[in-house]
Amino acid sequence: MRIADYSVTKAVLDRHGFTFKKSFGQNFLTDTNILQKIVDTAEIDQNVNVIEIGPGIGALTEFLAENAAEVMAFEIDDRLVPILADTLRDFDNVQVVNQDILKADLQTQIKQFKNPDLPIKVVANLPYYITTPILMHLIESKIPFQEFVVMMQREVADRISAEPNTKAYGSLSIAVQYYMTAKVAFIVPRTVFVPAPNVDSAILKMVRRDQPLIEIKDEDFFFRVSRLSFVHRRKTLWNNLTSHFGKSEDIKTKLEKGLALADIKPSIRGEALSIQDFGKLADALKEVGL
């Protein structure tokens, strides 16, 4: 019997008197086929260390520990630590870290792996309410995570993996795809969780690029320009730019010069621009003094 089998999950929760906290976005997966599929998608083997976020009672952790060299699982809810010690007692390659992943010193933590030189993959069922902050925190860290295979709200997965000229495409798509490739691997129905969430989930596979997708002069400015271009999705790029930078004649002149330099029409909408287009735009606006 697996931890994820419904009868086992229920027995574990009952034995420990565990109640779910909405503030932690807790939904436990009870489908072993999906858990195996996650491990297969992540291509976990003995030559890989894994960081897991939000292990819950250890359903996914069990599958990871059977395949990986070592698993480091970050759990913010201290009520789950003794439960994990119980459910994962047969594994000597699992470290449970009772800490918020956003506050963890990951550079120090990964040195605690028995073999810290192995490639590191992130595999997790992320809480819906904090998916984006966790992802961006990990992506922007200086730790060379090889890839992420993470479960999240389907809508967020669609936004991250979206292409230009689609409804889902936006600044989040750009922020992630600048660093990583992103593809939805498969959909997970809401019915396989306890308690069941209100929406379906998706498994998103993200692989780190050897180099960022494009070369730009100022990354912070690039991300700022991409974000402001989607503040009002139905407005033109020109309207979003002037709303942010200002509408004085001097600013308008600089914006006109920058757009011309990047060969981008002011009447276009942000959703029509590729990441490469945003790179050219940011560099051009920087060049004209914005």
Swiss-Prot record:
It catalyses: adenosine(1518)/adenosine(1519) in 16S rRNA + 4 S-adenosyl-L-methionine = N(6)-dimethyladenosine(1518)/N(6)-dimethyladenosine(1519) in 16S rRNA + 4 S-adenosyl-L-homocysteine + 4 H(+). It is found in: Cytoplasm. Its EC number is 2.1.1.182. This is Ribosomal RNA small subunit methyltransferase A. It is an enzyme of class 2 (transferase). S-adenosyl-L-methionine binds at residues 27, 29, 54, 75, 100, 125. Keywords: Cytoplasm, Methyltransferase, RNA-binding, rRNA processing, S-adenosyl-L-methionine, Transferase. SMART domains: rADc (SM00650). GO terms for cellular component: cytosol. NCBIfam families: ksgA (TIGR00755). PROSITE patterns: RRNA_A_DIMETH, SAM_RNA_A_N6_MT. Belongs to the class I-like SAM-binding methyltransferase superfamily. rRNA adenine N(6)-methyltransferase family. RsmA subfamily. The keyword Disulfide bond does not apply. Specifically dimethylates two adjacent adenosines (A1518 and A1519) in the loop of a conserved hairpin near the 3'-end of 16S rRNA in the 30S particle. May play a critical role in biogenesis of 30S subunits. The keyword Transferase applies. Gene3D superfamilies: Ribosomal RNA adenine dimethylase-like, domain 2, Vaccinia Virus protein VP39. GO terms for molecular function: 16S rRNA (adenine(1518)-N(6)/adenine(1519)-N(6))-dimethyltransferase activity; RNA binding. It comes from Streptococcus pyogenes serotype M5 (strain Manfredo).
